Every structure is written in C-alpha cells, then in structure tokens.
Regions:
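Transmembrane alpha-helix termini and helix-breaking/packing motifs in multi-pass membrane transporters
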Residues: 38-39, 43, 158-180, 267, ...
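C-terminal ends and interior cores of transmembrane alpha-helices
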Residues: 87-103, 312-324
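C-terminal membrane-cytosol helix-exit motif in multi-pass small-molecule transporters
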Residues: 164, 190-212, 406-414
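Hydrophobic core of transmembrane alpha-helices in multi-pass small-molecule transporters
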Residues: 24, 92, 102-123, 328-342
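Central cavity-lining transmembrane alpha-helices of secondary-active solute carriers
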Residues: 53-71, 159, 280-292
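Helix-loop boundary and gating motifs at the non-cytosolic
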Residues: 6-64, 237-279
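Helix-to-loop junctions at the C-terminal end of transmembrane segments
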Residues: 65-77, 168, 289-302, 386-387
Length: 425
C-alpha cells in the first residue's frame, strides 16, 4: 500500500509559496485601509481637497515606485527591493497611528506603498509577477500560478474589507471613540507590514534575475552585467500592449467600485448594507473566475481567453445600464463580474511569456504603470459625464464600448503572437 502523501501545490517552490503568502497578508491590509482611510482623514478634520491630495499621493507612489522597480529591481536585487518597500509599508502605518500632522500624513502616503483603490496595482505586483515564473517546476502551470496569485489576493482583500468593521466592534465593546478605534487599524497595518518584511527575508537567491553568461575564447564562462532594459523587439511588443492596456484601464475607471456603488444607491435607493453584500458576492465570483480562466487558457490560449471572456462581460456592462429593476441589474452585474477579471491572470502570464526572462520585471512594471496613470484620470471624466448628461448610466455605456474596442484591437494585433509554450502545443 502506497502511504506517500501528495503535497499540495508540489509544482510551486518554497519561494513561490512565500510570494503567495505575502500577497495574502498585503491584500488583507489594503482591504481594510481602502475603506477606512478617507473616513479617518475626514474625522480628524481635513477637508475634501486635502483628503484628495493624500489619496492622490498614494497613486503617485504606485507610479513612481513601480517605475523604480521596473528599471532597478533586477540590478539592486528583487529581494532587497521587496524588503525595502515592505519596511516603508510598515513605517507609513506607524506614522498614521502616531500623528495627525498633515505634512507627515501626506509624506507617509507617498512613501508607504499604500493602496486604496480596492485592487493592487503597485510596485510589489510588478516585482512578484516577474518572480513567479521562476517558482514553478512545470511550465504548464504558468497560467495556474497567476490565477492562484490573483485568487488569493482577491479573497484576502475581501476579508480585509470585512475587517474594516472592527472599529465599530471596538467602540461598542470597549467604549473607544470612533477616531481611536480606527487608529488601532493603523497599528494592525503596520504590524502586517512587519510580517511581510519577515516573509521577504525568507526568500532565496533563486528569485533574482540571472546574469547573462558568455563563453570566452578559452571556453571560460564570463558573466555579463545585468541590464534591466528591453530589447528593440520587446520594446515594440510591450509598447503596443501598454498602449492597449492603458485604454482598457481608462475605460475601467468609469466603473470603479465607488461609481457602481453610487449608481446602485442613486438609481434604486439601495441600502449600503445591501450594496456591500452585492460587492462581496461579486468578489467571490471574481476570485473563482481566475482559476477558470487558467483552465480555459490552457485549452484555447491566452489571447483568446482574454478577448472572448472580456467581450461578453462588457456587453453585460452595457446591459446593466438599461436594467429596469434592481434584481435584473444585480443579476447582470454579477454575471458581468464572473467574467470581467478573467483577463487579469492571463494578461499577466502573457506579458512575462512574450519577453526574455531578464526583461520580465521591466515589462511587468511598464504595463502596470500605463494602467495606473490612465485609471487615475478616468473617474474624474466619469464624474463630468454624470454631471453633464441626464443619463445616470452613461459611464457604464462609455466604459463598455471603449473596452469592446480595446478587445477587438488586441485580438487583431496579437492573435498570432503566441508565447513559446503555446507554439509547442
């Protein structure tokens, strides 16, 4: 009788599992911070403009730190840079707990890798996306590892959002005032940052980008200096992808969670508690869709999966805009959310698969920056549309149409550019 036990995820190295755990801890922290940060700043007396500047600082951090990671992480060391960013994450939480001085808080927001968008788009993501292919021992698991990475992050983010209710519990159980009860979550955030530092310290040298090797005339091996840049061919590919992803992200900014929440509240008078339930169910559907996306991609390819799951989701987005009743709107919205993020793990897998190994960090970073910049602009445009047009659902229609156009352009430009593993099939 065979008594050997199968180790779960045996195809994933120890480093890969540590990266997954770091993503869970980080996403959980981002989850509750994304809910409580603006509320806390309002409670301690800052006006909407000052709050907006702090939130903008977090977006600037995402762009600047991702840019630094894109071009220096492989030279300095991926592990070192991850540790440095995690230390800054912990320090920022401590600053928010310790003081209400505006200069200190806006500085903490800029240096602290704080994420308040409800999804993770920062520098950690770019470095980890480049590392993941080196943590699997089976090339066929490439799509699966990105699906797993995104799925656990989504579940952890949802759990973090639920944890944002802890201040209310502390108020009733221990008689704390609202401000002090929220401030304790900054202690938790800082502590989780320390935990992430510990996880990154445990990573091995295997996660680093490998130096190129050349052979001299005497057959001795010589290490070439590591250059964190893209070849002319990769620049062309990543340039096109970045432009297209920027369009997709811009369209996505029309239907970020806060705008969808506003739409449900305004059009149907939905209670905030019900809205939170809708988003929670949507989060679960999204998380499971990542694994389904990996399975589909293994069968039909990454580009086909990205396009032919995305187009139906965007048609559903437009349909939601014309839903006459709340139940119909919820059904179509949830159906849309079950499909809309299936391009995320497949997109990440495709980016690192079509460039050389030493180009992965730069490729992931550049494409993430393009998404961050355009998505930061579109909510303001959506607000202008809502204010200018009599049609409350206009952002849904605009977003859906632009996204469908993106899908069509992506398909016709990249349908024949298959990653090496797909070409072998």
């Amino acid at each position: 009788m065979d008594t050997k036990m199968t180790i779960p995820f045996s195809w994933l190295s120890k480093d890969g599992r540590l990266i997954i755990v770091a993503r869970i801890v980080r996403a959980f922290a981002y989850g509750f911070l994304s809910v409580i940060l603006a509320i806390y700043l309002k409670l301690i007396g800052f006006n909407d403009l000052l709050i907006g500047l702090i939130l903008t600082s977090t977006l600037l951090n995402s762009v600047v730190f991702t840019l630094v990671a894109s071009f220096y992480a492989d030279r300095i060391g991926r592990r070192k840079m991850l540790i440095a960013y995690a230390v800054l994450m912990s320090i920022s939480g401590a600053i928010f707990f310790a003081t209400s001085n505006y200069i200190a808080l806006i500085t903490a927001a800029f240096i602290g890798t704080i994420n308040v968008t409800g999804t993770e788009t920062g520098a950690f993501l770019s470095i980890e996306q480049a590392i993941l292919p080196q943590t699997i021992n089976d090339a066929k698991k490439m799509n699966t590892v990105y699906a797993l990475y995104n799925m656990v992050g989504t579940f952890a983010m949802s759990a973090g959002i639920l944890a944002s209710g802890l201040p209310s519990i502390l108020e009733h159980a221990y008689g704390l005032n609202q401000i002090d009860s929220i401030r304790l979550l900054f202690v938790l955030y800082s502590s989780l940052g320390v935990g992430v530092v510990g996880i990154y310290f445990s990573l091995s040298k295997k996660i680093e980008a490998e130096e190129g090797i050349t052979v001299a005339n005497d057959n001795s091996k010589i290490s070439k200096p590591l250059k964190q840049s893209l070849s002319p061919k990769s620049k062309q590919v990543i340039g096109k992808l970045s432009g297209l992803f920027a369009i997709d992200s811009f369209a996505g900014g029309f239907v970020i969670q806060s705008i969808v929440s506003f739409w449900f509240f305004t059009k149907f008078g939905v209670d905030l508690t019900i809205i939170s339930y809708i988003f929670s169910i949507a989060g679960v559907l999204t998380a499971f869709s990542f694994i389904v996306a990996a399975k589909i991609a293994d069968k039909v390819g990454l580009i086909n999966t990205m396009v032919f799951t995305h187009i139906p989701s965007n048609i559903l987005l437009i349909v939601v805009a014309f839903a006459p009743t709340l139940p119909i709107a919820v059904i179509f919205y949830l159906a849309r959310m079950a499909l809309s993020q299936m391009d995320v793990p497949t997109r990440q897998s495709y980016i690192v698969a079509v460039v050389k190994e030493e180009e992965r960090t730069a490729a992931a970073g550049i494409t993430n920056i393009s998404r961050n910049v355009t998505q930061a602009a579109s909510p303001s445009v959506a607000g202008y549309i809502l204010q200018s047009l009599p049609f409350l659902s206009a952002p849904f229609v605009f977003g859906g149409v632009i996204k469908i156009a993106y899908d069509v352009i992506l398909y016709f430009n990249f349908r024949n550019m298959k990653p090496p593993d797909e070409k072998k099939q």
